[in-house]
Amino acid sequence: MPLRDYNAAVDFVDRNVAEGRGGKIAFIDPQRSLSYGELRDAVARVGPMLARLGVEQENRIALVLKDTVDFPILFWGAIRAGIVPVLLNTRLTADQYRYLLEDSRSRVVFASSEFLPVIEEAAADLPHLRTIIAVGDAPAPTLQLANLLATEQEGGAPAATCADDIAYWQYSSGTTGMPKGVMHVHSSPRVMAENAGRRIGYREDDVVFSAAKLFFAYGLGNAMFCPMGIGATSVLYPERPTADSVFDTLRLHQPTLLFAVPTLYAAMLADPRSRTETLPDRLRLCVSAGEPLPAQVGLNWRNRFGHDIVNGVGSTEMGHLFLTNLPHAVEYGTSGVPVDGYRLRLVGDRGQDVADDEIGELLVSGGSSAAGYWNQRDKTRTTFVGEWTRTGDKYHRRADGVYTYCGRTDDIFKVSGIWVSPFEIEQALMSHAKVLEAAVIPAEDTDGLIKPKAFIVLASRGDIDPGALFDELKEHVKSAIGPWKYPRWIQIMDDLPKTSSGKLQRYLLREMTLGGIEATESAPSEPALYGRVVAGNGR
């Protein structure tokens, strides 16, 4: 554990230089690379620059940045100066940014050039905000990061911070409600780097590529904390990743570790290039998190590329991965075992511990737990209970300690008096060759009884026989997981509703169903809550 007097930036940046890695490449983006020594020099100049802008220790600055080498410069530069970077999603609307900037009371916003118009709209007349700085080219009189840093001839000394000082914020994406500012302390990155780093097996000579972005907790741990914790190299990709761009990046940089979300792995398998493309010879491990990995995606990946995908679980509140498959013992359909350094519990509705082979809410204890939510005392007390952090996820634990995801606490429902996991039905549907994605919710039949309803995205579009497809999928699910769990209705969608971080928004599907919205062939394709009812009568 870090000492009481501790600055995370000194540990992750200065230490690498002191240990002889000053000339080693820390980050690579499409435009340039940055050695650990160059990173240290740039990071040291950020504090004096922020001071000239009127930002004081413990103030907050907002980062709305693409994944380029400027991200670690500003992130660690602020932390080194005792200033708190607030990492914001780059895919939001002006109203959403305004809420986050008001809530965080950020003094300065650093935004990649293409985001300036929406940030300027969001920031109009905000009382706490002093200025907006462009990262990249921008027309006068907009201030530019490169020019401001160039005027700083000498770096400043690191701030006198302690391990329990707030280091950075991220906002929980959530699937409902307003985002919450999750506050992490200076000691948290080191805990994440050591715990998750050991489980994944990071090495100093690794080249890491994370398709998950740095503003996400998953991406921040993958591409920043874990590789920097051991002195490895990260490849950054600034644009939104696609199957094509990931294949290109793998071919160009030949990484040893690949991190992505299940949706991207599925998209890569569905892309025509997957039939001819090979993975880099030196690629050692593929990791998935951000949402549960469907077993069929993992199996298809193994069959096509000869690599397993390690399924991992983390959260914004815990910072990074706390539960994963063991890299040498992947078991698809499960979430694996706790990462060393974390303890897990399953509890029932009254907070009592549940036995093996029962379903309960997952609680986590570990040194990377957030300090709480900003200005959300009631929600902080509900989520952070003593040493335990409530995840809101339902899990099943076997006697051998292996955990399996069952859904969110408000997703589980009973059919014929038996608890049903929507995720289990979704996995069964996605194991069928014609189904790319699936979401399952409870719906009432004509007798008022609860039955599963499925929404699916087809693997390939074209003419279908609705009745035949429904019968085919129904029998497939019944044979896979049980005769009472099959969906009584199936609806085809162009896309499933998701948050900007890729999490499925089942509540929107529930609202549509409860609202009595009947989708038809003539319904609009946007928003994505309309599609074709394939078949089903609730029986």
Curated annotation (Swiss-Prot):
One of its GO terms (molecular function) is benzoate-CoA ligase activity. Its EC number is 6.2.1.25, 6.2.1.27. It comes from the Bacteria. Keywords: ATP-binding, Ligase, Nucleotide-binding. Disulfide bonds: none annotated. InterPro entries: AMP-bd_C, AMP-bd_C_sf, AMP-dep_synth/lig_dom, Benz_CoA_lig. Optimum pH is above 9. GO terms for biological process: secondary metabolite biosynthetic process. It is an enzyme of class 6 (ligase). It catalyses: 4-hydroxybenzoate + ATP + CoA = 4-hydroxybenzoyl-CoA + AMP + diphosphate; benzoate + ATP + CoA = benzoyl-CoA + AMP + diphosphate. Homodimer. NCBIfam families: benz_CoA_lig. This is 4-hydroxybenzoate--CoA/benzoate--CoA ligase. It comes from Rhodopseudomonas palustris (strain ATCC BAA-98 / CGA009).
